[in-house]
Amino acid sequence: MGTFTSFRKAYGALKDTTTVGLAKVNSEFKDLDIAIVKATNHVESPPKERHVRKIFSATSVIQPRADVAYCIHALSKRLSKTRNWVVAMKVLIVIHRTLREGDPTFREELLNYSHRRHILRISNFKDDTSPLAWDCSAWVRTYALFLEERLECYRVLKYDIEAERLPKASGAASKTHRTRMLSGEDLLEQLPALQQLLYRLIGCQPEGAAYSNYLIQYALALVLKESFKIYCAINDGIINLVDMFFEMSRHDAVKALNIYKRAGQQAENLAEFYDYCKGLELARNFQFPTLRQPPPSFLATMEEYIKEAPQSGSVQKKLEYQEKEEEEQEQEEEQPEEPAEEENQNENTENDQPLIEEEEEEPKEEIEVEEAKPSPLIDTDDLLGLHEINPKAAEIEQNNAFSLAIYPPGHETSAPSNSLSLIEAGGSGWELALVTPQNNNNNNNNPRPVIATKLGGGFDNLLLDSLYEDDTARRQIQLTNAGYGFGATAIPGALASSNPNPFGVQQDPFAMSNNMAPPTNVQMAMQQQQMMMMNNQSPYNNNYSPYHHHQFSPNPSTSSSPNPFGDPFLALPAPPSSTTQQQYSPNHMLL
C-alpha cells in the first residue's frame, strides 16, 4: 500500500512538472497558468499563499475582463479533467478564497460563466484509489454544492454576506445586517435563500477518514467562518419578520411561519454542527456563538393568527391601489373643462366668505362635477349604427330628380300625368324610387291621409300608379316605332279612361293584342261572327237592311272593345275614299 501511494505521488509530481513546462512554451498567460498549476498541484497540503496572491492579482479590477474570464476557464478546465481528490479540493479552495478575499469582478464573471457552463457541478466526481480518497471525494462533492449555493445566494441578495460591512445601529452596541432593515416582501424572498445556503453549509460535515485529514479541515475552517455571518443575517431577518408578522395577509403569513419553523430547526442542526467541529485542530481557536431557540408559545400565537388573517395579500393591495389611481386619472381626464371653470369662479367668489361656508359648499361642487360627466362615446343601444344618418346617402336622396318629381318638398303631391311628363323628360330609373323617405309628406302644408295613399310596406299608391303609367307609355312608344300604330290615335283616350294600376281593376288579359293584326282567315271568321251577333241584337234593322251583313264598320277606330277577337275591324285599315260614301249610302252594295 505504501509503494502504491509513493507511486501516485511521483506520478502526480511528474504531471505537474509537465503541465508547467507546457504553460511556459504555449500559453499566452504564462504566469497565470503556472500559478494555477502550482496552487492546485498533487501535493496533499493547502495552496501556497504566493500562488494564490498571483491569482488574486490576475483577477483584480485593474485587469481586463478577458483575463478574469481566462482564469475562470483555466480553473474550470483543471477541475473537470482531474480524477484526483487533492487537485479537485485545491481548485475549490482557490475559488472559495478568491470569492471571499478577491475582487468582486471575479464573483461577477464566475456567476456569468456558471450560466453557460456549470463549473461547480461535479456530482459524478469520484476518486476510488483508496478508502481515504473515497471519503474525501464525498466531501469534495458536498463542498462544491456549498460554493454553488453561495453563488445562487449572491444572485438573489445582490450582495455578498462575507464582504458586507456591517453598520452599527443607533443606540446599539452590536452591528446589524441588511436583513434587519428590509421590507416584508424582500424578507420573504431573501430569507429562504439564506436558509438554503445554511442548509448546504451544515451538510459540509466530514465523515469517516475525511474528518482527520488536514486539507479537509483547512477547507472546513473557511466554511465555519462564513457560518457565523450567515446565521446572524438569518437571525436579524427573523426578528424583523416577527415584527411585521401580525400585519401580513394569510398568504404571506403562511410563508413567514414556514420560515420561522425552518429557522428553529436549522438553529438546532447548526448547534450540533458546531459541537461536532469543536474537536477539530483548526477549530480550536474559533469562538462559536450560542444559539437560542425561538419560544414555542410564540409559534402557537402565529398559528392562531393565520386562522384569522385576511385573505387579501399585500401584492393585491398594491394592485388595487394602482387600479384606483388609474380610475381617478381617467375620471379627471373625462371631466369637461366648463365645470372646472365654474369651480374656479365659485372659488374666487367664495374666497371672500368665511372658511366654514367653504367647507359646506365643497360637497355641492363635487356633486355638480359628477353630474356634468359626459356620456360615453359609444351608444350601447345602437351598436350597429342603424340610427346614424349617412351624409352621402342623404345628399344623393336630395339630388334625386325622380323622387323630387314625385314628391317635391314643400308642395302637395302632383297628379300622375305630371310625374309622367317629368319621367319622359329624363329621369333616373324608377326602381331607385320605389321607397321614398317618410319625411317627404311631413314637409307639406296639407299632408295627405296616410291610410288613403299608403300601402303595405310603406309604398305610396300614387307612386305605383305613376310608375305603371310610365311603363304603359313606354311600351306604346315602342310598338309605334315598330310599325304597329294603327290604333295610336285612340290610345291616349283609352289610357286616360283606364285605371293606371292593372292590379286595382280586373282587365282583359288579351288587351295587349289589340295593336296586332290577326291573319286573313281569322279576320273573315270574326267578321261573320260579329254580323251574326249584331243581327241577333237588333231585329228591327235586319228587316230593312237584309244586306247589312256585308257592310263594313264605318269607323273601326272608335270602337274600343276589350276583346280583340270580338272586334275584328280594330286592326283593319279604313278605305281612304269610300268611307264617307258608305256613311250616307246604305245601299251602296247594290251598285
Curated annotation (Swiss-Prot):
Subcellular location: Membrane, Clathrin-coated pit; Golgi apparatus; Cytoplasmic vesicle, Clathrin-coated vesicle
This protein's GO CC annotations: clathrin-coated pit; clathrin-coated vesicle; Golgi apparatus; plastid
Parts of the chain that traverse the membrane: none
Region of interest (Disordered), ranges: 310-381, 536-591
Acidic residues bias locations: 323-345, 355-369
Pfam families given in the database record: ANTH (PF07651)
GO terms assigned for molecular function: 1-phosphatidylinositol binding; clathrin binding
UniProt keyword annotations, A-Z: Coated pit, Cytoplasmic vesicle, Endocytosis, Golgi apparatus, Membrane
CDD domains cross-referenced by the UniProt entry: ANTH_N (cd03564)
Domain ENTH: 24-161
One GO-annotated biological process of the protein: clathrin coat assembly
Major subcellular site: membrane
Superkingdom per UniProt: Eukaryota
Bias kind Low complexity: ranges: 553-564
Family matches, as InterPro entries: ANTH_dom (IPR011417), ANTH_dom_sf (IPR014712), ANTH_N_plant (IPR048050), AP180-like (IPR045192), ENTH (IPR013809), ENTH_VHS (IPR008942)
Composition bias, Polar residues: 577-591
Protein's recorded name: Putative clathrin assembly protein At5g57200
Source organism per UniProt: Arabidopsis thaliana (Mouse-ear cress)
